[in-house]
Each structure stands twice: as C-alpha cells, then as structure tokens.
C-alpha cells in the first residue's frame, strides 16, 4: 500500500517525508508547479494606486511569497497605510513573518465566504481593493466586494502550471508503488488527475 502525494513543491516533498518518517509508503508526484505570475512585474504600479485606508487582500501563501519577493527585488517595502487581509490564518501568518505588518483574517475557516463574513468588510463602498492571487480560482471575493461598492483590482502574483507526465511511465510507477490512497488539496488538481489516461 502506498500514498500518492500530488501537492506542489515544496509542501508535497515535506508531506511525503513526514509520512515516510511515520512509517508509511509514499511518493511525491506533483500535478502542478508554482511559478511567478504574469502580472507580478506590475505589482508596484498597482500598489501605488492605493491610498491610505484602502484594502489589500492576500489570497494564498504563494501570493504572499511571490509579492514579497518582487518588492524585495525592487527594494520596496509594503505600505504601512493599508488594511491587510489574509484568506486564512496560514496565509496571514506567512505575511506577518515576512513583513511584520498586522493583518486581519477569519478566526475560523480559510475560504472567501469566511473572509467576506468579517464585520470590517461589510461597509467598503468607494474603497480601493487590490487582490493578490494566482491564476484561475474562484471569483466570489472580487464579485462580492464589487457588489458592496468597492473598486476592485487584481494582480496575478503566481500561476499554477499543470505538469504533463508521460502517461505510460507514470502509470507504471503508480502500479509498481501499489498506490491505494491519493492526497491532494485542490479540486482542479483532482480534475487534472481524473482527466489523465494513466489512472
């Protein structure tokens, strides 16, 4: 019996190693890789459009990492005049560790619905909002903030790129490893897996 870990690097390798250390048979075959987003180079311009009291949303740890990396490359710092929001606790903690800025996030849950339920986001009419995100994903947050009267802009800080394995080789590896369990964390990865010929 073996467990197939499909999470991207480095989290996938870390999870695989923890399972092996716990005495489980596991192997890592990520279905996506994470790369810099198509709009990362214009992040600074988008930040400069925000004014004191505007809102900046960080929608994943990858968005935090790539945005922070870009600002460091430009020798720029995060503005201290904005309200920062994280999609959840892990994203917020990543941001706080890298920047030392305070950031708000839902006490429970890590979804757009949880974030939108915060009382401080109910009255945001005419406020500028910048969403730092990856490619694809849900539009609920942007749509709802616009419905509440916010002026919403987005910046694709990172992108998820599907890895195209050679079907026959991967099918043989999966069979030889006697995979019985699959560990993933996003619906789009499961769809990619199910659409492949090697399962």
UniProtKB/Swiss-Prot annotation:
Pfam family, one: HEM4
An individual GO BP term: uroporphyrinogen III biosynthetic process
Superkingdom as given in the UniProt entry: Bacteria
Keyword Lyase listed: yes
Entry's EC annotation: 4.2.1.75
Reaction catalyzed: hydroxymethylbilane = uroporphyrinogen III + H2O
Metabolic or biological pathway, per its Swiss-Prot or TrEMBL entry: Porphyrin-containing compound metabolism; protoporphyrin-IX biosynthesis; coproporphyrinogen-III from 5-aminolevulinate: step 3/4
InterPro entries in the cross-refs: 4pyrrol_syn_uPrphyn_synt_sf (IPR036108), 4pyrrol_synth_uPrphyn_synth (IPR003754), UROS/Hem4 (IPR039793)
Keywords assigned: Lyase, Porphyrin biosynthesis
Top enzyme class: lyase
A GO term for molecular function: uroporphyrinogen-III synthase activity
Entry annotated with the keyword Lyase: yes
Record's function text: Catalyzes cyclization of the linear tetrapyrrole, hydroxymethylbilane, to the macrocyclic uroporphyrinogen III.
Protein family: Belongs to the uroporphyrinogen-III synthase family.
Designated name of the protein: Uroporphyrinogen-III synthase
Name of the gene: hemD
């Amino acid at each position: 019996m073996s467990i197939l870990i499909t999470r991207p690097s480095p989290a996938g390798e870390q999870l695989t190693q923890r399972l092996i250390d716990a005495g489980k048979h596991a192997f890592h075959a990520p279905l996506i890789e994470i790369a810099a987003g198509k709009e990362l180079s214009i992040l600074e311009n988008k930040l400069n459009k925000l004014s004191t009291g505007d809102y900046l949303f960080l929608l994943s740890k990858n968005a935090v990492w790539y945005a922070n990396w870009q600002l460091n490359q430009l020798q720029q710092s995060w503005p201290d005049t904005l309200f920062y929001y994280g999609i959840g606790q892990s994203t917020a903690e990543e941001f706080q560790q890298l920047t030392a800025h305070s950031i708000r996030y839902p006490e429970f849950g890590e979804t757009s619905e949880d974030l939108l339920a915060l009382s401080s986001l109910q009255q945001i009419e005419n406020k500028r909002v910048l969403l730092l995100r990856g490619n694809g994903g849900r539009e609920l947050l942007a749509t709802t903030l616009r419905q509440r009267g916010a002026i919403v802009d987005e910046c694709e800080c990172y992108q998820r790129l599907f890895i195209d394995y050679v079907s026959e080789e991967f099918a043989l590896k999966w069979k030889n490893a006697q995979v019985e369990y699959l560990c993933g964390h996003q619906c789009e990865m499961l769809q990619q897996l199910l659409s492949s010929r090697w399962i």
